[in-house]
Amino acid sequence: MKKLFLIALFALLPFSLNAESNLDKILSSGVLKVGTTGDWDPMTMKDPATNKYKGFDIDVMNELAKDMGVKVEFVPAEWKTIVSGITSARYDISTSVTKTPKRAEVAGFTDTYYKYATVPLVLKKNLKKFPTWDSLNNSKVTIATTLGTSQEEKAKEFFPKSKLNSIEAPARDFQEVLAGRADGNITSSTEANKLVIK
């Protein structure tokens, strides 16, 4: 059972505000402030050696700023406050934000640019123990998620019998699995593909 989700390219400043005046503000300041977590490989990653961001979303934002004739400023953000950073005008725009009804009440979203599946991950040695989604929905199982992500909400929905361990960023849910503190984690197929390769 794979669950597909859609990601809007950006969450924008509160749509109740005049979009034209928001654009005017960005153009007159000459800076597009972009909120990004820097922890979702390959979309947005912060290089600890250089303190610079890289990834698909970063490339898109650099091109958008170039097309607008402004500079881009990447603002560190956390998943649990990614939308409130927009509504409080800490930054103008954010990337790779899953559109949910709750988020759409307070922020505008562009069209979807990327689709992914939400998938569980377990250690290879435990594949026989957890061959299906249902095998993870058990009161003896601990599922790790990253606090504030759409995957955290989906873990509650998919695994109501399991113990959920929501990890505060910058720590990551998969690290709990590797350390033996969780039996599995739930993440995007995008990140899962990168983790399986590693």
Residue ranges and their predicted role:
Residues 4-16:
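Sec-dependent N-terminal signal peptides
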Residues 44-50, 61-70, 132-137, 151-167, ...:
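Ligand-binding cleft/hinge of the Venus flytrap
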